Amino acid sequence: MTKMIVGLGNPGDKYEKTKHNMGFMALDLLAKELNVDFKEEKPFMSLVASTFVNGEKLFLVKPLTFMNESGRSVAPLLKYYNIDEADLTVMHDDLDSPVGRVRLRQKGSSGGQNGIKSVITHVGSQTFNRVKIGIGRPKHGMTVGNHVLSGFDNEDKEIAQDGIFKAVDAMKFYLENGDFQKTMNKFN
């Protein structure tokens, strides 16, 4: 069985350390721990790394389409590699959770996260796994757009990093046992 883990974010140095790029940051760490490198797959508008874990093929994907169009990369990759959406996991930032909190879900709506909304639209299904990494709500007077495109302040940086570590630990556990429900039970 082939699995795909997607990290959502925005491409480019300008966005590298922003809250909206928690999915990219977590996927970069997972790739480092699995000792794989990304290469650009232009037809799929993505950076893709592949390896085998416990005898199963694994693709790690960073869409280069910008957050709100992520599904334009993910759907064609699923189709090309014949991966069922139940074997897709998407890691992303979550406004509705405190900074650094990690929540895993098996399916559901976008919850207002535009990258997830795009994946649902293009894949045509809500039945894929999610790893939500909390970035908290905007402080008083700040718009959601400015909040997600800003970096973490010093007091939240370490907490956010801990969330990334926990998300990666959850994915490694999932890859070892192949059971997302079991992973949810352990990490939620």
UniProtKB/Swiss-Prot annotation:
One CC-aspect GO term: cytoplasm
Site (Stabilizes the basic form of H active site to accept a proton): 93
Residues given in the record as tRNA binding sites: 15, 66, 68, 114
Enzyme class: hydrolase
Subcellular location: Cytoplasm
Highest rank taxon of the organism: Bacteria
Site note Discriminates between blocked and unblocked aminoacyl-tRNA, residues: 10
Residue numbers annotated as active site: 20 (proton acceptor)
SUPFAM superfamilies according to UniProt: Peptidyl-tRNA hydrolase-like (SSF53178)
Catalytic reaction(s) noted: an N-acyl-L-alpha-aminoacyl-tRNA + H2O = an N-acyl-L-amino acid + a tRNA + H(+)
Gene Ontology terms: biological process: protein quality control for misfolded or incompletely synthesized proteins; rescue of stalled ribosome
InterPro entries xrefs: Pept_tRNA_hydro, Pept_tRNA_hydro_CS, Pept_tRNA_hydro_sf
Keywords: Cytoplasm, Hydrolase, RNA-binding, tRNA-binding
Gene3D superfamilies: Peptidyl-tRNA hydrolase
Function: Hydrolyzes ribosome-free peptidyl-tRNAs (with 1 or more amino acids incorporated), which drop off the ribosome during protein synthesis, or as a result of ribosome stalling. Catalyzes the release of premature peptidyl moieties from peptidyl-tRNA molecules trapped in stalled 50S ribosomal subunits, and thus maintains levels of free tRNAs and 50S ribosomes.
Assembly information from the UniProt record: Monomer.
Protein name according to UniProt: Peptidyl-tRNA hydrolase
Gene name linked to the record: pth
